[in-house]
Amino acid sequence: MTILRLNGGKILNEKVHEIGVIAMGSYLENHGSALPIDTDIKIASYVSLMACIKTGAKFLGTVIPSTEYSYVKHGIHNKVSDIVEYLTFLLTWAKRIGIKKVIIVNCHGGNILAEKEIKELENLINIKIKFLSFPLTHAATEELSIGYVIGIANKEKMKEHKPENYAEIGMVGLREAREKNKEIDEEAKRVEKEGVKIDEELGKKLLDEFINKVVNEITNFL
């Protein structure tokens, strides 16, 4: 049997090989004109991978299914049970490569609906799970700014990236969602008042905060 050189490379210590990071977001959601439909999962993947590079933890990939509140209609989503099924497969294989603790980095608000069921997998699979969520106002300034920093936002399309053109921006035009969810309505009102823009400094600041939070959780797991 091959003996692995666990102390190789730039890592916090050898125990970090027992920690995995999984990105969770959404692959199929409209995000106006300046951001791609898979913005959430790309941001979550970037944050997850950077935290792993900084610490030596293992980036275990992404959760493909996502879920959403029934009244938020801006994409194609799945059932909570689909997420649980996919994660069960992923976590079972993670254990086979020595993973004992996992941090799930979620950048899609709707996935919070699955948090309880995800935590229940701890006992089912016998693996420690930390669920970290970084919700951002949909397709608005924060997401635009982060997207620009990581290279997925198209600045040339910002002229048309407005709520009056795309209802999902800030969820301003998603009337049912605003009526049924107070937080969504408050965010939409803020977007109506302030508009949306790309702020590179804000994007860098938020990315650093998110990455550092994941790094801290990895450190706490050691």
Curated annotation (Swiss-Prot):
Q: Establish whether keyword Transferase is in the entry.
A: no
Q: Which UniProt keywords apply?
A: Hydrolase, Iron, Metal-binding, Zinc
Question: Catalysed reaction per UniProt?
Answer: 2-amino-5-formylamino-6-(5-phospho-D-ribosylamino)pyrimidin-4(3H)-one + H2O = 2,5-diamino-6-(1-D-ribosylamino)pyrimidin-4(3H)-one 5'-phosphate + formate + H(+)
Gene Ontology biological process terms, A to Z:
F420-0 metabolic process; riboflavin biosynthetic process
Select a single GO molecular function from the record's annotations and give it.
Answer: ferrous iron binding
Q: Which residues bind Fe cation 2?
A: 31, 40
How would you classify this enzyme at the top EC level? hydrolase
E.C. designation(s): 3.5.1.102
- Which positions are annotated as binding Fe cation 1? 29, 40, 108
Pathway(s) this gene product operates in, as recorded in its UniProt entry: Cofactor biosynthesis; coenzyme F420 biosynthesis; Cofactor biosynthesis; riboflavin biosynthesis
Note the InterPro entries from the entry.
Creatininase-like_sf, Creatininase/forma_Hydrolase, FAPy_deformylase
Cofactor(s) of this protein: Fe(2+); Zn(2+)
Instruction: Give the cofactor note text.
Output: Requires one Fe(2+) ion for activity.
Check the record and name the PANTHER family matching this protein: 2-AMINO-5-FORMYLAMINO-6-RIBOSYLAMINOPYRIMIDIN-4(3H)-ONE 5'-MONOPHOSPHATE DEFORMYLASE, 3-DEHYDRO-SCYLLO-INOSOSE HYDROLASE
How this chain assembles, per its entry, is: Homodimer.
NCBIfam families with a match to the protein in the record: ArfB_arch_rifla
Similarity field: Belongs to the creatininase superfamily. FAPy deformylase family.
- Relate the protein's function as given in its record: Catalyzes the hydrolysis of the formamide of 2-amino-5-formylamino-6-ribosylamino-4(3H)-pyrimidinone 5'-monophosphate (FAPy) to form 2,5-diamino-6-ribosylamino-4(3H)-pyrimidinone 5'-phosphate (APy).
Return the protein name: 2-amino-5-formylamino-6-ribosylaminopyrimidin-4(3H)-one 5'-monophosphate deformylase
- What is the originating organism of this protein? Methanocaldococcus infernus (strain DSM 11812 / JCM 15783 / ME)
Q: What is the lineage of its organism?
A: Archaea, Methanobacteriati, Methanobacteriota, Methanomada group, Methanococci
The gene from which this protein is expressed is arfB
